[in-house]
């Protein structure tokens, strides 16, 4: 049976050809290799029809133009040469579109990303809608790749090299107003008149390129170019720590095109695309993409979720305010906040106001839309308005008796179907539900701070939690824009459990004489966004260390922190950034000076700060403990799969994405190598480095956690 075409041609009475993009059976339009013949057949028809005045590409999907190329095409390539051929085929197709003798216009609504933007760049003009769904970008770098269908050559010539480099190197997505300001699109119109606006543009002569600003023209010349690429290269190296080869190749390819012409540029682009597709970094990043997509499709349980019409939140503090924001402004659900103090309610309301007002200032949101979203949030000091809430999220202090009291109050003041979700980071959910009348409706819903930025949530059912409660909570998390993983109700859950030994080891090295900045720099060089000591300062030393005694009580000596170090720091009223006193010095608000270690910290904990370990040795000690604990979590069924373990670590604590997560990283090293490293470290530093039984068994059998495919498990 012949597959329905993703590209169809219709000619209007005014002799404008409309090419409609609609990939059959898919929510999103993505470009596949087999579509090339369909497009070429349409191009042939257009060339043969001498009466045509112009061409318009438009999508039939309600919220996307083209979301990019099908990533599976890259995974199917076995060699760099095969991936290079794929890129050259894309380049050739775009060149054929651009070579049409009549104006070709892209009518863009919704996501126009990757290969979709490259197709739009191959057109002679672009019109997009003013809808918030409309975004344009080249996010290939986030998959360890570069744009392979001409994007590295066309974009710098259209909007200027410095602006293009920023887009390509970061994967930054532009909204409509930004795109028209930079010259990426020719016009921005309401969705209702998109097609007509594009048709009118197609009836004119080919749109002439807008002259680049003087600055961009200078930067494209030999002298300006040399300075620009040196500066951008240095900045990029500092940001990536040399862990992402795609950024270096992007700079090389763009510069080649500007210095030697487009022919050399296209050649360099295709070659670099092929080579990058085979790098372990790209393979790991693509695996993370597939795994996160898979997690987002996972309903959490087989039961159907209950309806979600409104949510209540207990506590208007930092976490409560953040949860209220994502519930109202991302999920679009009415939120009622209860706090015993009106100031708590005001704090939560101001939290959402600050987030939304920032969007208004950046022109990402209209003031009227801000007011509409804020109207979804209300507050109370009692349970007025809570009677019919479908789900209550508790975000009060980490105190078991208090949380048990909250369960009792919710059961007394809310409907019998109301779910109670605790945002605890350390207390067992089973204990919180111990006296509940309806324990099947009690569950953990652990957000990470800052709530609006951190993508992960842990969903923690206890032994009596119902399947429907799990499914409903997963549904809410997804509506809030989060990536949820379901974890077992054991001390520390998953993320904090694997994070604690990592931070403990950093503190232990600090007491042994390693410098704070050396420890942090070593882990940043390894690939973490911040080092473990700085992370402790950022989350709050009191908050970050509160869970350590809980974990030590549950799992024993391997979770013990260096004696008296944490208490010495806390007794000196050091809580980190939040009170301006931590491991680092904090100047006045708004001060942009380079962060500096507080030298008073060393005598406080009886350390010298001399240091003798290399950066790789520092990173090895912290990371190996994290890997070992992640495997234990899998063995104890704290996580349901290695997929969840990798996603939880990458999205929850910033485990280096280019390594693919703890389990992908173990596979890349080999279980045997990991066991050998840990046995060496155990001999040097103690039994906490003893590899767990599962790792030893896998080492002996030569097993790995993942199969070679992106989503299958052993």
Swiss-Prot record:
Q: Which GO terms describe its cellular component?
A: cytoplasm
Q: To which pathway does this protein belong?
A: Lipid metabolism; fatty acid beta-oxidation
Where does the record place the site Important for catalytic activity? 118, 140
Q: What is its EC number?
A: 4.2.1.17, 5.1.2.3, 1.1.1.35
Q: Does the keyword rRNA processing apply?
A: no
Q: Which Pfam families match?
A: 3HCDH, 3HCDH_N, ECH_1
Q: Which UniProt keywords apply?
A: Cytoplasm, Fatty acid metabolism, Isomerase, Lipid degradation, Lipid metabolism, Lyase, Multifunctional enzyme, NAD, Oxidoreductase
What PROSITE patterns does UniProt report for this protein, alphabetically?
3HCDH
* Catalytic activity reported: a (3S)-3-hydroxyacyl-CoA = a (2E)-enoyl-CoA + H2O; a 4-saturated-(3S)-3-hydroxyacyl-CoA = a (3E)-enoyl-CoA + H2O; a (3S)-3-hydroxyacyl-CoA + NAD(+) = a 3-oxoacyl-CoA + NADH + H(+); (3S)-3-hydroxybutanoyl-CoA = (3R)-3-hydroxybutanoyl-CoA
In this chain, the stretch annotated as 3-hydroxyacyl-CoA dehydrogenase covers 306-714
| Domain of life of the organism encoding this protein | Bacteria
InterPro entries from the xrefs?
3-OHacyl-CoA_DH_CS (IPR006180), 3-OHacyl-CoA_DH_NAD-bd (IPR006176), 3HC_DH_C (IPR006108), 6-PGluconate_DH-like_C_sf (IPR008927), ClpP/crotonase-like_dom_sf (IPR029045), Enoyl-CoA_hydra/iso (IPR001753), FA_oxidation_alpha_subunit (IPR050136), FadJ (IPR012802)
Quote the CDD domains the UniProt record gives.
crotonase-like
Write out the similarity annotation: In the N-terminal section; belongs to the enoyl-CoA hydratase/isomerase family. In the central section; belongs to the 3-hydroxyacyl-CoA dehydrogenase family.
Protein name in UniProt = Fatty acid oxidation complex subunit alpha
What is the species listed in this Swiss-Prot or TrEMBL entry? Escherichia coli O45:K1 (strain S88 / ExPEC)
State which gene encodes it.
fadJ
């Amino acid at each position: 049976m012949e597959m329905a075409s993703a590209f169809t041609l219709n000619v209007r009475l005014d002799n404008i050809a409309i090419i409609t993009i609609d990939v059959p059976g898919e929510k999103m339009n993505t470009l596949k290799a087999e579509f090339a013949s369909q497009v070429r057949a349409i191009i042939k028809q257009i060339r043969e029809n001498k009466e045509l005045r112009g061409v318009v590409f438009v999508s039939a999907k309600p919220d996307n133009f083209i979301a990019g190329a099908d990533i599976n095409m890259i995974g199917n390539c076995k060699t760099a040469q095969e991936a290079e051929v794929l890129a050259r085929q894309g380049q050739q197709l775009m060149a054929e579109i651009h070579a049409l003798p009549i104006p070709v216009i892209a009518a863009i609504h919704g996501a126009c990303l990757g290969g979709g933007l490259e197709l739009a760049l191959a057109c002679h003009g672009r019109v997009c809608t003013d809808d918030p769904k409309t975004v344009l970008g080249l996010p290939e770098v986030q998959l360890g790749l570069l744009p392979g269908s001409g994007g590295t050559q066309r974009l710098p010539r259209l909007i200027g090299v410095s602006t293009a480099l920023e887009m390509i190197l970061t994967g930054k997505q532009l909204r409509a107003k930004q795109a028209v300001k930079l010259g990426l699109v020719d016009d921005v119109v309401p969705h209702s008149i998109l097609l007509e606006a594009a048709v009118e543009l197609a009836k004119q002569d080919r749109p002439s390129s807008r002259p680049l600003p003087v600055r961009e023209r200078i930067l494209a010349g030999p002298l300006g170019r040399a300075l620009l690429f040196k500066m951008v290269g240095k900045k990029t190296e500092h940001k990536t720590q040399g862990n992402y080869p795609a950024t270096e190749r992007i700079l090389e390819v763009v510069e080649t095109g500007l210095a030697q012409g487009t022919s050399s540029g296209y050649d360099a682009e295709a070659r670099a695309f092929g080579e990058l597709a085979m790098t372990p970094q790209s393979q790991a990043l693509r695996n993370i993409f597939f795994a996160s997509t898979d997690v987002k499709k996972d309903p959490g349980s087989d039961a159907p979720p209950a309806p979600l019409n409104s949510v209540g939140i207990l506590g208007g503090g930092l976490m409560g305010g953040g949860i209220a924001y994502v519930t109202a402004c991302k999920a679009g659900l009415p939120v009622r906040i209860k706090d015993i103090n009106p100031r708590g309610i005001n704090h939560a309301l101001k939290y959402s106001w600050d987030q939304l007002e920032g969007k208004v200032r950046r022109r990402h949101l209209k003031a009227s839309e801000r007011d509409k979203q804020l109207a979804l949030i209300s507050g109370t000091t009692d349970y007025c308005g809570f009677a019919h809430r479908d789900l209550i999220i508790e975000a009060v202090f980490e105190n078991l008796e208090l949380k048990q009291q909250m369960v009792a109050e919710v059961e007394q003041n809310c409907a019998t179907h109301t779910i109670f979700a605790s945002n605890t980071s350390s207390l067992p959910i089973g204990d919180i539900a111990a006296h509940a009348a309806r324990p099947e409706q009690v569950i953990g819903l652990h957000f990470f701070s800052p709530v609006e930025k951190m993508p992960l949530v842990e969903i923690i059912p206890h032994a009596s939690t119902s399947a429907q409660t799990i499914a409903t909570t997963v549904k809410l998390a997804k509506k809030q824009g989060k990536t949820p993983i379901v974890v077992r109700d054991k001390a520390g859950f998953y993320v904090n459990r694997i994070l604690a030994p990592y931070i403990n080891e950093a503190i232990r090295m600090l007491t042994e004489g390693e410098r704070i900045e050396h420890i942090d720099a070593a882990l940043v060089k390894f690939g973490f966004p911040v080092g473990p000591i700085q992370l402790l300062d950022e989350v709050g030393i009191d908050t970050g260390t509160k869970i350590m005694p809980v974990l030590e009580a549950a799992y024993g000596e391997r979770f013990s922190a260096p004696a008296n170090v944490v208490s010495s720091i806390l007794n000196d009223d050091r809580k980190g950034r939040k009170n301006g006193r931590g491991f680092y010095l904090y100047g006045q608000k708004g001060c942009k000076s380079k962060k500096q270690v507080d030298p008073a910290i060393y005598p406080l904990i009886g350390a010298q700060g001399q240091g003798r370990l290399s950066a790789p040795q520092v990173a090895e000690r912290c990371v190996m403990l994290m890997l070992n604990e992640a495997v234990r979590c899998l063995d104890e069924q704290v996580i349901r799969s290695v997929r969840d373990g990798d996603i939880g670590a990458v999205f929850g604590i910033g485990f280096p994405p280019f390594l693919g997560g703890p389990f992908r990283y173990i596979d890349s090293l080999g279980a045997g190598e990991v066991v050998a490293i840990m046995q060496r470290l155990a001999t040097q530093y103690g039994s906490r480095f003893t590899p767990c039984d599962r790792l030893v068994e896998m080492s002996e059998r030569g097993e790995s956690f993942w199969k070679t495919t992106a989503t299958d498990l052993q």
